[in-house]
């Protein structure tokens, strides 16, 4: 069922979170520049429905909502809903005739992966996290190629470590990053995701107040939706509003990374890979409710390299963060060393590696 036209085609399944969608977009853009026709498979309610068309790619939707749940009726209905979504995915494959199907996570990957296998189309999986999700664990048994971002992600099957595809602008930023702390003030970027991280919003105003008594420190704090007024008021109450920029969202992360000397953040897979690529030291506070605690495993990639500090959320307080940031403010050379160690573990050609696997499978026919 391989497409006989000269133009190669790929159907990409990635959705739900930016950690799935953005790496997939990097691969999609690369293959598109190589003359490939790219189409997406996702769900209408998740972020891929908005993001993918914004980047110029067509998307088809399958209906798999309601599969998860604890109610008896949902459990009884689940097999039928999964079967229906597989049939919907097969219809897309029959119409589009891809040479390769690639799954990078999200609800559509499961049905789409099964449909690819039933249709005789090569299936490539890419796992972004250091611990594989349930869908990729199951699909890995039927995939043509299994790829992962971090060494040791899959322990019972053959998998190739290729890194996480990230935007080429961030790789270029890391290439240009020649020094850190080029002035006296320690510049701290605090990123809590689109909803913010309550722990950061609660403690960072006091951290800035405490560190500023002995060191010069400025903060760029992304607080998330609906948190701007309260967090800004707390910085102001503590007399720190002149040393902080508070924003609900940071649209230009390239500019934020360029500005920062150190980052305080969660440890999602894409974040960890971006920190490595741009060569930034970090204080990582894994999201404690992540499935299988995969963010802690992600963080250890940088921590074990000496590029980051791991701070489990239950022990995070003003004192802990003050101690770490004061230490870095006092030792600029170590700050630079940590940034270099982060860069040393980066896999900078991840996009090309993933794309080349797809190209190789398509050429095999």
Swiss-Prot record:
Q: Which reaction does it catalyse?
A: di-trans,octa-cis-undecaprenyl diphospho-N-acetyl-alpha-D-muramoyl-L-alanyl-D-glutamyl-meso-2,6-diaminopimeloyl-D-alanyl-D-alanine + UDP-N-acetyl-alpha-D-glucosamine = di-trans,octa-cis-undecaprenyl diphospho-[N-acetyl-alpha-D-glucosaminyl-(1->4)]-N-acetyl-alpha-D-muramoyl-L-alanyl-D-glutamyl-meso-2,6-diaminopimeloyl-D-alanyl-D-alanine + UDP + H(+)
Compartments where located:
Cell inner membrane
Enumerate the Pfam families for this protein.
Answer: Glyco_tran_28_C, Glyco_transf_28
Query: Is Membrane tagged as a keyword?
Result: yes
InterPro entries xref list: GlcNAc_MurG, Glyco_trans_28_C, GlycoTrans_28_N
Annotated Gene Ontology cellular component terms: plasma membrane
**Residues that coordinate or bind UDP-N-acetyl-alpha-D-glucosamine:** 17-19, 129, 167, 194, 250, 269-274, 295
- Which pathway or pathways does this protein act in? Cell wall biogenesis; peptidoglycan biosynthesis
The Gene Ontology biological process terms listed for this entry are: carbohydrate metabolic process; cell division; cell wall organization; lipid glycosylation; peptidoglycan biosynthetic process; regulation of cell shape
- What is the topology of this protein in the membrane according to its UniProt annotation? Peripheral membrane protein
Q: What NCBIfam families does the database record attribute to this sequence? A: murG
Q: What is this protein called?
A: UDP-N-acetylglucosamine--N-acetylmuramyl-(pentapeptide) pyrophosphoryl-undecaprenol N-acetylglucosamine transferase
